[in-house]
Amino acid sequence: MAYDAFGKPGYGPDFNSAFSPGMGGGAGFNEYDQSSQPSVDRQQGAGNKLRPVTIKQILNASQVHADAEFKIDGVEVGQVTFVGVLRNIHAQTTNTTYQIEDGTGMIEVRHWEHIDALSELATDTYVRVYGNIKIFSGKIYIASQYIRTIKDHNEVHFHFLEAIAVHLHFTQKANAVNGANAPGYGTSNALGYNNISSNGAANSLEQKLAEYSLTPAQMTVMQAIHSAPETNEGVHVRQLAQSVGPGIDLTAVTDFLQQEGIIYTTIDENHFKSVLQDQ
């Protein structure tokens, strides 16, 4: 499930995944093409354990002192991997910076090597990032070794499930040591995803929408709207398209949902909010 040196499973010596090792980090999506991956020192240690995280977890990472490893869930982390939508690219003389957001937050990613493979990256597409957490002038950013475009949207969903599983592993272990009750699925605050965390949030939305008898496609769009960060402007149709993936006629679905009075436009015809978010 986790990877040592971008390939070997294992978040740590005591992590026994409920998933098969071959599923680690979306390995089912053939992401580990060794010919295109950066070389990594294979020594064991926190700095060489690749951990799946959300951007919120990165931004909330802590250090004991300036030279210490960053910690997430009280555990030292070195290399991290996350997925998100590439919002901005800024090429400079010595490096290229990318602004990436995943619904839990936004972070700057810096890449110092000019690799031809990165030229295929485009804004408003999902990417996977590998790198290390750094801080400069009080601002956390990611020093990236590798960034690639995500071609199978299932990888996005799998990543968040994996991040939840690892988060629960470490937090449940800590609670057990401290004699506290092990948490169920209350992971939304730590991970930043209010609607990915539990049966509760998802089921609550489904219960509220039950009276509308929505199709699976319409329900998928509603879930995407509620999963996006809640703002006064709502969610842009472009972000919705990225979230729901291909195969859904987004125009037809949003038109229907507007006619039913379930969603409405805000600052322009491309931004939508759910009426349930106002309740």
UniProtKB/Swiss-Prot annotation:
Residues 80-140 bind DNA. One of its GO terms (cellular component) is chromosome, telomeric region. Signal peptide: none annotated. GO terms for molecular function: telomeric DNA binding. GO terms for biological process: DNA replication; DNA replication, synthesis of primer; double-strand break repair via homologous recombination; nucleotide-excision repair; transcription elongation by RNA polymerase I. InterPro entries: NA-bd_OB-fold, NA-bd_OB_tRNA, RFA2-like, Rfa2/RPA32, RPA_C, WH-like_DNA-bd_sf, WH_DNA-bd_sf. Phosphorylated in a cell cycle-dependent manner. Hypophosphorylated in G1, becomes phosphorylated at the G1/S boundary, it is maintained in this state through the M phase. Pfam families: RPA_C, tRNA_anti-codon. Keywords: DNA replication, DNA-binding, Nucleus, Phosphoprotein. Belongs to the replication factor A protein 2 family. Heterotrimer of 68, 30, and 12 kDa chains. Binds to single-stranded sequences. This is Replication factor A protein 2.
